[in-house]
């Protein structure tokens, strides 16, 4: 895997992943955002093929059978997956492939790419702030929000498996940190090449 780079973003619902992802794509033109496939209902303001590829459960299960996905998982009773072929094509074009996945997806992608993939865990300063953000989104009922907070607590136990941590308490600072991490990936590539030359 000599071309491109892989950056994985994970974090609890409501931490600001979508905002930071959009900002990164706007700041670095060579970023390819891997659009996940999902069986969950489309939310207001979302577009098929832009935010997600929305499919039926039957379609998703058939894709699993056909080994379409690099990784897939069932989250909050819905299925999410990452198609492998477009990722491979983007890497061949020397792009930075950006993933926005849950902790389980992070582990699967890391297992596939190894040290070639770098990862960022994004979270809020504390659980109360996360709860406020989830409520302000007005996309979930209170029961779902409490369930998401439990999931967030579980996800926080995996922080040590990530290369970077961003506490998103100031959106401007968080955006700058994301861009700096993404730009550093090319330097890490040079470091890998240097090691190869030394061995040669």
UniProtKB/Swiss-Prot annotation:
Cellular component GO terms held in the UniProt record: cytosol
Catalytic activity: GMP + ATP = GDP + ADP
GO MF, any single term: ATP binding
Residues at which ATP binds: 11-18
Intracellular or extracellular location(s): Cytoplasm
Membrane-spanning parts: none
Protein name: Guanylate kinase
Naturally occurring in which organism (per UniProt): Helicobacter hepaticus (strain ATCC 51449 / 3B1)
Taxonomic path: Bacteria, Pseudomonadati, Campylobacterota, Epsilonproteobacteria, Campylobacterales
Gene designation per UniProt: gmk
């Amino acid at each position: 895997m000599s071309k491109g780079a892989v950056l994985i973003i994970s974090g609890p619902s409501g931490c600001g992943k979508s905002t930071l992802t959009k900002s990164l794509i706007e700041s670095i033109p060579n970023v390819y955002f891997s659009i996940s496939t999902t069986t969950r209902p489309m939310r207001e303001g979302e577009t098929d093929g832009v935010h997600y590829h929305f499919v039926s459960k039957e379609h998703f299960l058939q894709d699993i059978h056909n080994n379409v996905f690099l990784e897939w998982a069932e989250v909050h009773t819905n299925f999410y997956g990452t198609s492998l072929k477009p990722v491979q094509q983007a890497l061949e074009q020397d792009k930075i492939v950006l993933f926005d996945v849950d902790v389980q997806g992070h582990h699967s992608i890391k297992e596939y790419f190894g040290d070639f993939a770098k990862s960022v865990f994004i979270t809020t300063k504390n659980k109360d702030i996360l709860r406020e953000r989830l409520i302000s989104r007005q996309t979930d009922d209170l029961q779902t929000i409490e369930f998401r907070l439990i999931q967030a607590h579980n996800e926080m136990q995996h922080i040590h498996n990530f290369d970077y941590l961003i506490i998103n308490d100031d959106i401007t600072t968080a955006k700058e940190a994301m861009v700096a991490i993404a730009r550093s990936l090319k330097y890490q590539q040079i470091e890998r090449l240097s090691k190869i030359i030394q061995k040669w």
